[in-house]
Regions:
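Onset of an N-terminal alpha helix
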Residues: 39, 43, 71-74
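Residue-level detector of alpha-helical hydrophobic segments embedded in or interacting with membranes
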Residues: 20-21, 50-52
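Catalytic glycan-binding domains that act on GlcNAc-containing polysaccharides
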Residues: 32, 53-224
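N-terminal secretory signal peptides and thylakoid transit peptides that target proteins
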Residues: 1-18
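Cleaved targeting-peptide boundary
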Residues: 29-39
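N-terminal signal peptide c-region/cleavage motif recognized by signal peptidases
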Residues: 23-25
Length: 224
């Protein structure tokens, strides 16, 4: 199944994005991924990862504890995100989609949240001076390289998060798991510390430990 929306909707998204861009301050670390040649096998794999595009399914968990842990994470992250996204349903849908797309790409949700914070400040229609778009500041050339060529659709929440996660996963693979270098490549500043340090610092704000899943501490022994 391919990610498709009617052309009219894409035009509407483009107009909304343009208006939003005029109202937004410049983005300090906005992405500017550099277009590089892709091997046919890499292009095919990334296109396949992008193209498997049904909306996030009903989440399934191995057991009730895993589901309850996810719900606790969702509640905690929603509370943290409230100041940046005040509308409750939009906030929950964003977090559900980000969790799904992060896990699908083998990424830590806290890392992706940190990247979104640095890249766009959680603004759906953010546009950088280099033309990067949306939450994860995806460059338009990616729509041509691994998508259907319609860069306007990069403003759609799930599409933007999917592209961003697939691209970051690709850069991690290229850099053989070196997160520092992969983040620099994502931002077009490979080898420089400012951007990776900003994302890794932001990740700490979104890290979460499920206290309910921790083993209870042993009772203190009493002297006799």
């Amino acid at each position: 199944m391919t990610l498709r929306t009617p052309g009219r909707r894409a035009a509407v998204f483009g107009l909304a994005a343009g208006a939003a861009a005029l109202a937004c301050p410049p983005l300090a670390f906005a992405g500017a991924q550099k277009e590089e040649p892709l091997a046919d096998s890499v292009r095919s794999a990334m296109s396949a990862a992008i193209g498997q595009s049904a909306p996030p399914p009903t989440l399934r968990f191995d057991n009730i504890d895993a589901r309850l842990g996810y719900l606790r994470w969702l509640g905690a992250m929603s509370e943290k995100l409230k100041k940046r996204k005040s509308e409750g349903q939009e906030r929950i849908e964003f977090l559900q989609t980000l969790w799904y797309e992060s896990r699908r790409a083998g990424l830590e949700p806290a890392l992706v949240l940190g990247l979104v914070q640095v890249e766009s400040g959680f603004r759906k229609y953010a546009i950088s001076v280099s033309g990067a778009r949306g939450y994860m500041q995806v460059m338009p050339f990616w729509a041509r390289q691994i998508g259907d060529g319609d860069a306007a659709r990069l403003f759609l929440m799930q599409i933007n998060l999917r592209f961003g996660c697939v691209i970051l996963r690709h850069y991690l693979d290229v850099e053989r798991g070196d997160l520092f270098m992969a983040l620099g490549r994502y931002n077009g500043s490979r080898g420089q510390a400012a951007y990776p340090d900003a994302v890794l610092g932001a990740r700490k704000q979104w890290s979460w430990t499920d206290a309910s899943a921790l083993p209870a501490s042993a009772p203190a022994s009493t002297a006799r």
